[in-house]
Amino acid sequence: MKFKYYFSKDFQTSDNHDIETLKTHYYHARKEVAIEAVVQMAKDFKCKIKSIDEERGEIIFDNVNYNASATITATSYTEMAIDFIVLTFNFLPTAPGKKVIEKFYSVLDKTLQFKGISLYK
């Protein structure tokens, strides 16, 4: 991990990210099922759901340590890409956003049928 990431308070996933654990994850699921899984995951992490936009596939949630946004993009009817943006509130940032995203993906990998990482870069 690059030095600049150790002091960053915000992290975002993408297909082309240079950190392997922050690359987009793809799942074999319908959009409604993926949205439901992300909402349930957020509730399990004791987050408050701020907004759910099913048309755009965006879910915004937060708790006392971070704000997060999940974007669910349909690459086909039964394949979804899920990306996260996490902004943390820690006084001494030591890449906590990266750890939060890794926890999110580990839960979703068990909940949804995992297809792959960064499939369409």
Q: What kind of feature is each model-predicted range?
A:
Residues 1-121:
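Ser/Thr-rich, low-complexity intrinsically disordered terminal regions
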